[in-house]
Amino acid sequence: MKKNYALITGATAGIGLEIARELARLGHNIILTARREDRLRDISAQLMQEFNIDCNYVSADLAEFSAPDKIFNFCSEENYLVDILVNNAGYSINKKFHETGEEEEEKFLRVLGISIIALTKKFIPEMLERKNGKIMMVSSLASFAPPASGWGALYGPVKTFVNRFGDAININYRSQGITSTNVCPGFTVTEFHSASGMQDAMDKVPAFMKQDSTTVAIGAVNAMMKGKTVWISGILNKFIAFICNVLPASIVIKMSSSLAGGRYE
């Protein structure tokens, strides 16, 4: 008999790890996926011991074309039913646009964009059969504004695409029992910034603008379980998103440029 599972990408650190912990705390069986197999193995054992749920993992690099197939085939072979899909994996390129190689950009777009499409496409058919499924798109506050000056040109626009893709899933499948939630964190304290070479910039962000990954993850999971279309973490971030939507684009661009000393996750 098949058992239901929640699949989380980018699950070995930061928001992804805390989402896995929160779902496990709520009693969901977990499938972890990320690149670091040693971390996956350790976290899987911890979750099973702490929360008395079933947890398994598959190591995959979403920058590789074959990764979504590898993940889906693993779930099929193990007879897992994925009724919760958390598209969380991501990173940023700490270079200006003209300094970034095309191969590097292609890998970036595959992790943050193409793999989300592929995984969602692969798991939706089984959700449709059961008329039940929840999908989380971990986007960013950066999706509401142009990228900050000096921080590249792809991260914010790709996250804007993620939002629109999540909206499209809702439009096409909500009436059939499948919901998609766009989760938009602001400055969140995780390994994201050090891994992307941005820790110095993150250190300059005022403390009142930062959130911890556990708080963000709990709010994100709660929003997904309620079937919300979009969830922005924190009152300040909600205000920033509102301002970005109502002010003229020229003003928003100037405001975004002033954030060169910081970075959205």
Where is each model-derived feature located?
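Conserved glycine-rich Rossmann-like NAD(P)H-binding loop of the short-chain dehydrogenase/reductase
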Residues: 26-43
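Conserved NAD(P)H cofactor-binding loop of Rossmann-fold oxidoreductase domains
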Residues: 88-93
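C-terminal helical subdomain
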Residues: 182, 203-239
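Substrate-binding pocket helix/loop in short-chain dehydrogenase/reductase
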Residues: 96-98, 104-109
